[in-house]
């Protein structure tokens, strides 16, 4: 078993100290909430990405991937309207590229507020998400990054609220 820890527990101050502590405590990797590293992660420069990758690699840890993908972006919504949906998908596609640049292999899609149905029909949203998540999975395949759907309870969101629904989504996309 490999153990990784999120940077959410530490924040962004004294990041090297955090990496050192993780290694000393027997962790193998780190998961990052990208907006805790950069104000706007997808606008990070090649140099900033290389610096972070080197920093993690030099610590002896593996960069596993990203979670809390849309934490700092309440404007990005899958089901609010078509314009927001397109911007959300584009943003996630850019996060796949960023994750790959850092050597990561997974994006964990929780983002409960960003996947709210906003009163829209569940079946319509489900169909649209199949197409959108397939597009994301295709980009992930090109970059060797997995897009993982995190089922969240109904007290957090109203879309993909059980392991069963998450499993059905994965089977439907079949990627």
Write out the residue ranges for each language-model feature.
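Catalytic domains of carbohydrate-active enzymes, especially glycoside hydrolases
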Residues: 16-35, 103
């Amino acid at each position: 078993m490999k153990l990784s820890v999120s940077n959410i527990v530490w924040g962004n101050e004294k990041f090297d100290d955090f990496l050192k502590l993780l290694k000393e405590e027997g962790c193998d990797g780190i998961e990052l909430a990208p907006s805790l590293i950069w104000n706007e992660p997808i606008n990070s420069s090649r140099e900033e990405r290389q610096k972070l990758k080197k920093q993690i690699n030099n610590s002896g840890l593996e960069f596993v991937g990203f979670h809390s993908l849309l934490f700092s972006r309440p404007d990005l919504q899958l089901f609010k309207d078509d314009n927001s949906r397109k911007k959300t998908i584009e943003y996630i596609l850019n996060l796949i590229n960023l994750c790959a640049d850092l050597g990561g292999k997974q994006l964990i899609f929780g983002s409960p507020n960003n996947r709210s149905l906003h009163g829209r029909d569940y079946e319509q949203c489900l169909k649209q998400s199949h197409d959108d998540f397939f597009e994301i999975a295709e980009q992930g395949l090109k970059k060797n990054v997995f897009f993982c759907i995190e089922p969240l309870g109904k007290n957090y969101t109203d879309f993909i609220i059980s392991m069963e629904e998450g499993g059905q989504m994965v089977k439907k996309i079949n990627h």
